[in-house]
């Protein structure tokens, strides 16, 4: 069927990642594609996604040796990726022998050759930041190597709504190149403005459909034909309150009062700040407040030393992320 495009728009937690991996698996099974690159906006989200792609590859490609790499500037500090780099290539078994103890999982490695400068995208499977792919459409040295690494693969681009106007322009050029290189592409977004959605379709060479239908939606382009399908919504309710501080009282003080009441009998809460300095100030405030003495406080921002940041990130995933295999057994 040639290169295909899918745009999945749905709220957080609706399974967009699983749907993208399912599509990738179908396209890889067709024999038209040679690998997978999963691109995300940040290093933290890339590290978390590596574990999910690793679990998929281990279950799906049993008995095979596959290269899986993490591509961003601090990948060497990721524990999961470090473990992959220490694995050697196993001795191949005779082709006509299949023992009772034959492996049921893929043997994933991160060969040193692909860890060279600008070579990461040549790995058959990789997870990383979006800039690794965007360098392929910029006038940078050896940009053709990045395009060569992407050619013929399934490429998943996450959080496409999160980029500014400049990066969105680069993203459209990337989508245009990916189609020319024989890639099939999945775009994931929570909410995608119509103008941005139409721009991405034009970059793929597709026409804008007559109507977009209801949200959440799945938009596919196969052989130049655009199809829009509504995804059945799940009944989910949220309670959103706007906190108004009394006259003369700082907003942070009012928010602390609200949290103290909510957490009096236990529970979890996240206080999300727009700057590192503000997050540090809130953290010190809660530390000094006796009403939070029974709470475990965790400060998480991008200015920690790399090793410490990785530890905190792992702790955040452990506390607030999905359960691991060990926890569900």
Regions found by a protein language model. Give the residues of each.
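N-terminal helicase ATP-binding lobe
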Residues: 1-329
């Amino acid at each position: 069927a040639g290169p295909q495009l899918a745009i999945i728009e749905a709220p957080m937690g609706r399974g967009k990642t699983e749907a993208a991996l399912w599509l990738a698996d179908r396209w890889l099974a067709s024999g038209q594609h040679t690998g997978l690159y999963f691109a995300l906006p940040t290093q933290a989200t890339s590290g978390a996604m590596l574990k999910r792609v690793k679990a998929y590859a281990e279950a799906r490609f049993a008995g095979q040796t596959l290269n899986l790499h993490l591509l961003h500037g601090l990948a060497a500090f990721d524990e999961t990726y470090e473990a992959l780099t220490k694995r050697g290539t196993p001795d191949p078994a005779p082709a006509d022998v299949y023992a009772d103890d034959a492996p049921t999982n893929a043997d994933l490695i991160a060969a040193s050759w692909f860890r060279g400068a600008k070579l990461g995208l040549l790995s058959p499977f990789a997870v990383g930041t979006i800039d690794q792919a965007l360098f392929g459409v910029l006038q940078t040295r050896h940009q053709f190597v990045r395009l060569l690494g992407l050619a013929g693969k399934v490429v998943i681009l996450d959080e496409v709504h999160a980029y500014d106007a400049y990066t969105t322009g680069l993203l459209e050029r990337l989508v245009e190149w990916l189609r020319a290189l024989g890639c099939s592409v999945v775009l994931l977004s929570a909410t995608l403005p119509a103008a941005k959605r139409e721009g991405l379709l034009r970059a793929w060479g597709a026409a804008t459909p007559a109507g977009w239908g209801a949200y959440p939606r799945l938009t596919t382009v196969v052989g130049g034909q655009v199809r829009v399908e509504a995804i059945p919504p799940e009944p989910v309710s949220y309670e959103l309150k706007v906190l108004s501080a009394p006259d003369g009282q700082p907003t942070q003080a009012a928010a602390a009062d609200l949290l103290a009441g909510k957490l009096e009998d236990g529970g979890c809460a996240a206080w999300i700040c727009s700057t590192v300095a503000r997050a540090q100030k809130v953290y010190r405030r809660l530390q000094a407040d006796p009403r939070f003495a029974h709470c475990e406080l965790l400060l998480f921002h991008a200015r920690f030393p790399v090793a410490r940041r990785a530890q905190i990130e792992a702790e955040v995933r452990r506390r607030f992320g999905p359960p691991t295999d060990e926890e569900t057994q």
